[in-house]
Amino acid sequence: MSNEPKSKRGGSSENRGGGNVWLVLLAVTGAVVLSAFLFSDNRRRLAYPHLKELLAMSAERQEMLEAQRSASESGDAAANVDGESRPESSVISRSSSALISGDPANDIPVPKIVVPSSTKEDVWHEFSRLDNIFVADDRITGKVHFKSFVKNHPSEKEPAEEVTFLTIRGYPNDLIAAELEDLLVQSGVKWDNDRPSRFLENHWPELLMIGVLVALGIVMLKRMGGVGSPMSFSRSRGKLYSEDDLPTTFEDVAGIEEAVDEVREVVDFLKNSEKYQSLGGRIPKGVLLVGPPGTGKTLLAKAIAGEAGVPFFSLSGSDFVEMFVGVGAARVRDMFTQAVNRAPCIIFIDELDALGKSRSGSVVGGHDEREQTLNALLVEMDGFDSNSGVIVVAATNRPETLDPALLRPGRFDRHVLVDRPDVAGREEILAVHVKNVKLDETVELKGIASITSGFVGADLANLVNEAALLAARNGKPAVAMEEFNEAVERVTAGLEKKNRVMNEDEKIRVAYHESGHALVAAALPNTDPVHKVSIIPRGLAALGYMMQRPESERFLMTKSELESQMKVMLAGTLAEEMIFQDISTGAQNDLERCTETARSMVMDYGMSRLGRINLRRNTRSPFLAGSGGGEYQIMHSDEMAKMIDKEVSRIVDDMLVHTREILEQRRDVLEAVTQRLLEVEAIDSDELMRLIQENSRGPWLVPGTVTEKPKAKIVPREETESQQSNRS
């Protein structure tokens, strides 16, 4: 088979888990560091009395500066008036001039105050000049020059540093406020009651932390498969494949020729749309592929896009419906918008039943997200231009659950059945799957196809793979017919349970049980031939099995064939009863299937004494066995139910009588087959027939049966017309 195409949206996600863990650790570490920085107060605490003392010292220093300046100005004026008559004053003036020529403030002692540190022992802070004080109602802040030193080593001081100080005022009264204001005025320090906004300066760490966390969150969403924009929930999740990514063609699709022929017109329209538009024709807007699981519906849709050479949007019906209201409808609209922009193209919706379920069960006046999404799909399919080159291909295996409005002409105009393949179809599918498998000369694909009745394409692909694995496990250079037969048994009956060892009594009982099935199946002419009998445990509960191989495809069953099947089902438990005068629980599945067959004959097929009537309606899915809770709708009264139970019991009892007669007449063959089973544990059809011929004393077929089934006499049309003319 061809390799699966690669999506353009696909990406490597092998290391996403580890990357997300490192991102989370990085985010937590950054948050801890920033939080520690934010909650740590690096402002120096300065008590209110110490602040007043510093302000008072600053006021004294300011007065000394003003006095010195006044003295300097007076000395300069006297020197200009009479510089030679006063020699002593000239000395003072020269010193004053020298003082002024420099920086007078440097010669004034700077007021200082030493206080112990509030955080470290034996450490003292030497506060000096204040600057830029802001006075608030509850606190005073500003800048202060300080040096730190150890108490026992006052000479070893740290370099001068300018930091922000904080003084808590408590609840000041008017006198204290007035006293502080006078000190501020006298100190000459710049101060204000209205500080300008410093939001960024004070809160930049918080803003930085928020920005880092938001950036990390966006990166983590992208790496975890999320999306970057807040509006991305409404974007379609369909995967876009270009024509180069779709190597699948109709040659890769085998066994469903009728379905391929139905969709060839779609490919021709995408290639030559002008031919249809010029004649006024309209291509179907939608193609619905219906069939059991594994029959190749998705593969057929890929082949359509690969043959047409157009873009291919692939998505599932569950990709639309989300927990957020309105998201599904928005995704539907976005999907069709993208498709129209890339027309001609194909939109493939797999599992359409997840989106298009019938609205008949909805609550009147209620709101359902799935119903809203379905309404959007109905509008888009019937709203966009039919000549736009956008074709919707959908697949489902539950068409009975779809809304009727979705199936009407104008939306899904064409319904294509992709059914289980027949013998010829299975042979073609096997030929496709074994292209890259080394086969032995003994392999016959036709023989494999004949023993795989009911298999779909996915089952056959798994069968070929199992056979190849078995050959590799056994060390063979090529896959032989033996591996294919073993693979069929593994798929149908399950894996061998070699560790499930039965005791000798159970093994003998199982051997008689399976021999009874095989003998009755071989004694009745209207049953499928026996392929293999085994007492090797397989699967979950099977301690042994008898495998039959149909000679041809069957679509109808007669009453005699159903009765023969019931006899084969009952033969196992009757063989146990005949040999051991006791029965076991191993016949549970046989009795269950036999009873259901008898009930179907009475209630569904009209094959009983109650008449040819139908007493129940089948509500099961035609493609999914066992789907749904109630599989049947009862259509009879309680009195009729009693009659049905009696008729079912009568039919089963009659089958028991006939089956017991068959086994009693062939007890010698039963013993021989059982003995051989205990020796080799498995016998094939050839060995079974040899044992029957060697140990059979009379005619093998059951008396009263015929080997050839009756056939209707076909009267030629000319003979019929001549008879009618003679009568007239």
UniProtKB/Swiss-Prot annotation:
Cross-referenced InterPro entries: AAA+_ATPase, AAA_lid_3, ATPase_AAA_core, ATPase_AAA_CS, FtsH, P-loop_NTPase, Peptidase_M41, Peptidase_M41-like
Cofactor(s) needed by this chain: Zn(2+)
Binding annotation for Zn(2+): 513, 517, 590
Binding site for ATP: 291-298
Any one Pfam family match given in the protein's UniProt record, by short name: AAA_lid_3
Main localization of the protein described in the UniProt heading: membrane
Keywords in alphabetical order: ATP-binding, Cell inner membrane, Cell membrane, Hydrolase, Membrane, Metal-binding, Metalloprotease, Nucleotide-binding, Protease, Transmembrane, Transmembrane helix, Zinc
Enzyme Commission number: 3.4.24.-
Annotated Gene Ontology cellular component terms: plasma membrane
Low complexity: bias regions: 88-99
Top-level division of the source organism's lineage: Bacteria
Active site: 514
Transmembrane segments: 19-39, 199-219
A single GO molecular function term of this UniProt record: ATP hydrolysis activity
Disulfide bonds: none
Membrane topology value: Multi-pass membrane protein
Biased composition (Basic and acidic residues): 709-720
Reported function: Acts as a processive, ATP-dependent zinc metallopeptidase for both cytoplasmic and membrane proteins. Plays a role in the quality control of integral membrane proteins.
Quaternary structure note: Homohexamer.
Annotated PANTHER family: ATP-DEPENDENT ZINC METALLOPROTEASE YME1L1, METALLOPROTEASE M41 FTSH
Family to which the UniProt record says this protein belongs: In the central section; belongs to the AAA ATPase family.
Official protein name in the record: ATP-dependent zinc metalloprotease FtsH 2
Species name: Rhodopirellula baltica (strain DSM 10527 / NCIMB 13988 / SH1)
